Amino acid sequence: MSKSENLYSAARELIPGGVNSPVRAFTGVGGTPLFIEKADGAYLYDVDGKAYIDYVGSWGPMVLGHNHPAIRNAVIEAAERGLSFGAPTEMEVKMAQLVTELVPTMDMVRMVNSGTEATMSAIRLARGFTGRDKIIKFEGCYHGHADCLLVKAGSGALTLGQPNSPGVPADFAKHTLTCTYNDLASVRAAFEQYPQEIACIIVEPVAGNMNCVPPLPEFLPGLRALCDEFGALLIIDEVMTGFRVALAGAQDYYGVEPDLTCLGKIIGGGMPVGAFGGRRDVMDALAPTGPVYQAGTLSGNPIAMAAGFACLNEVAQPGVHETLDELTTRLAEGLLEAAEEAGIPLVVNHVGGMFGIFFTDAESVTCYQDVMACDVERFKRFFHMMLDEGVYLAPSAFEAGFMSVAHSMEDINNTIDAARRVFAKL
């Protein structure tokens, strides 16, 4: 047995499923998950000593690559002053100044410890600010594991939500309406059925949890207009897209202004950080200045703030996002060319430093139904064959891939060459 297999066997006796987050267990592709020893730049190294070109990037945070010296040094320097104080620090102020400068729609920001905390808190704030209970989310979009968000669509677009996890009371889920991504008609229908009850829409501006599905040109502006028409708030969940699709996020890339923004992943530089913020009048409703409660023992942790501050300063340097786009575009085009040579139908969506690979005969993939029609079994085989070639992709047909500026064009070309060999046998 390999070291990964031995560790996985031991882990399953001690940790549910052997992992601390389900997708890591390779349940979406089968087989034994890799146990990682270290990472540097664009590469992961497993406990058996094998190196992989990494397109998971810790599920998004590693936009600069692994073990970036500026972040590592910031963490070491901060740790030497203490690990946690439970009191305000100067770095929290500096971090808030930087975030609000980089994302102009955020007048104020509150730091939390995860993307789930950010979305959960933003929704509570939207409900408290509007005095309404219902929210709209989209089929195939993921916003963390808060109870009100673990909801699937019912039998029709306007049915009340049903829990998609045991442990979520139906009374919670009934306040969540699930509409179809990229379908404004379904959203208008929900508003017309509940015109005075919907507090907010929460949306991934690029859906990264049904692989990678960009918005149609009219979709995000249409959501903004509907929120304005019916007095609801628009929450853009940029946990995945923030500082990756563009420096000011997907909201800037697509030209739409939310009322609230949720951030995570890159904002922590690899440390557990989330944030939410937006309009001053809305944020003023948050405790201690307002009645909507939110708190956290480790929120604004000095080590995490130092890592995030260093990361964002590097991400804000000229050329970073142009490099991400160039590398991702080359990878997408190369994969499509290699698939076409092998006669394999393939769609590759990409925006900024995000991409998604779909085995499908369709010309495009624009919604959850399109994603579900793709050939998942072929993806599973592709994943494992690429892993054997030393390329680490997301171990699920429903997760986006992530580029970093640490990837070289040689890494990209080697990945395309590996895919060409795999497609020939697929």
From Swiss-Prot:
Class of this enzyme: isomerase
> What is the top-level taxon of the source organism?
Bacteria
Q: Does the keyword Isomerase apply?
A: yes
Location in the cell: Cytoplasm
Q: A cellular component term (GO) from this record?
A: cytoplasm
Question: What is its cofactor?
Answer: pyridoxal 5'-phosphate
The record ties this protein, via InterPro entries, to: 4pyrrol_synth_GluAld_NH2Trfase (IPR004639), Aminotrans_3 (IPR005814), Aminotrans_3_PPA_site (IPR049704), PyrdxlP-dep_Trfase (IPR015424), PyrdxlP-dep_Trfase_major (IPR015421), PyrdxlP-dep_Trfase_small (IPR015422)
SUPFAM superfamilies for the chain: PLP-dependent transferases
Q: Which GO terms describe its molecular function?
A: glutamate-1-semialdehyde 2,1-aminomutase activity; pyridoxal phosphate binding; transaminase activity
Enumerate the catalysed reactions.
(S)-4-amino-5-oxopentanoate = 5-aminolevulinate
Protein name according to UniProt: Glutamate-1-semialdehyde 2,1-aminomutase
Organism lineage: Bacteria, Pseudomonadati, Pseudomonadota, Gammaproteobacteria, Enterobacterales
User: Which gene carries the instructions for this protein?
Assistant: hemL
